[in-house]
Amino acid sequence: MTAKRPLRIVGRRRVARRADGREVRRYVPNAGLSVPVVSILDRYGEVLEDEQRAVVRWAVQGGHGANIIFAAGTTGEWNRLDNRRRQQIARVVVDECHRINAAGVAVEAWVGITGDTRAETLENLEYALDLNAEAVVVTPLSIRDSNDPVDFVNREINALFERSKRSIPVFLYDNAEISAPGHAPHLHTRDVKQMSRMDYVRGVKVTAGKAVLGNYTRAASHFNRGGDFAIYAGDPYLIFDLFAPPKGAGGWTRHYWNRYWTRDSLPYGIVAGPSNAMPREWQRALRVCRNGDAALMHRYAQVLEDFRAACEFNRGGRSFRPTLACLKAALAEMGVCRSEALAPGTPAFSDGERREFARRFRDLRRRAAATLEPGWLSEAEAERPQPRRAVKDG
C-alpha cells in the first residue's frame, strides 16, 4: 500500500481513420488526476515563464502527481487575463509537458481555450492544435457572444476542424460561477447529449455539488454512443463521500443515496484545484478512494480538508476563502516559485492573513508527514527533466 510506482493512466490515441476528409483518432480519456495549474505572474501581470515551468514540474511530481496538467483554466485565472497571456501560458505549459514526457514520465497537457468571444475561443483552439496539446477544454456558457452552446460546439468548432483537416479531443466545462451575464448557470443535459454526438467531444468537467454531478452521471449512458464520455468532478472533495464504503446505518444510508444520485456511476476522474499545493497527496487520495480503503481514505481526507480549512478566514463575521492567493502562497512557501502576484480582480489576502496562512500551512505539512504514508508527501523536484538518450551497443 506504500508503493510509489507512478500511476500511468494516460489518454491514448488509437489507429487513425478518415471522416469527412479529416483525420480523426480514437481517444480514450485519462482517468487520473487533473491539476488545473495556477498562472504565475509578475506584479505587472506578465507571465513568468521559468516559474510557470517549475509549477508544472512540481504538479507532476516525477510521475507521482498529476496525470493531466490543465492550463488556462479558472484556477489559472483565464477570465482575468487577456488572450495574449492565455496563449502564452498554454504554450509554456504544453512545452514543459512535452519535455517531461520526453524524459519518460507520462503526463497530458490540456489547454483551456475559452475566450471572451467566439472569435477568441476559436483562435485559441487553433493555437492549441498548433501546440500539439492532448486536449482542450471549453466553457460554452462563459463565451459572451455565444447564445447557443450546441451551435458553437457542433457547428463552429466542427467547421474549424474541417478547414484545418485536424481535430483534437474537446472537453466541456460547466461552472455556474463563471457563466457570462444572461446565460444559464449550468449546461442542460439535453444540450450536452447533443454535443456529445460529435466525435471530438469526449467529456465534461462539472464544478458543482453532488446533485448537479448526479444529473450528468445519470444521463451519461445516453451520451456519445460512439465511444467513451468522461465526467470529471470539479469538486475533488466529493470523492471522499462518493467512494466511501458503507459502514453502519448512516454509512449505508449515504451509500444508497449516492447510488441514487449517480445511478451507480462514479466520476471518471477529478480536476483538483487544491492539488496545486499538494499534488502527490491528491494522487494517492484518488487511488485509495478507488480501492475503497476506508482507513486510508480517512487519513487523506483529514489532511486535505485541513488545507481547505487553512484557506478560510473571518472578515467582518463572515467566512472568506482567498483560494488562489493561498495556492500561490503555498507554492512560494515550498520554494516552487517566488511570485505570488494575482491577476487584477482575484481575491487577495488582507493584512495579517498571509502570515497566518504560512503558519497554518507549515503546521499542516508537519501533520501530513506524521499522518500519511511514506513517499506520499509532495516534494520539489531538483532539476528539469532531461530527455532519455539512446545507449549505443558495445
Model-derived segments and spans:
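Catalytic alpha/beta core domains of metabolic enzymes, predominantly
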Residues: 159-320
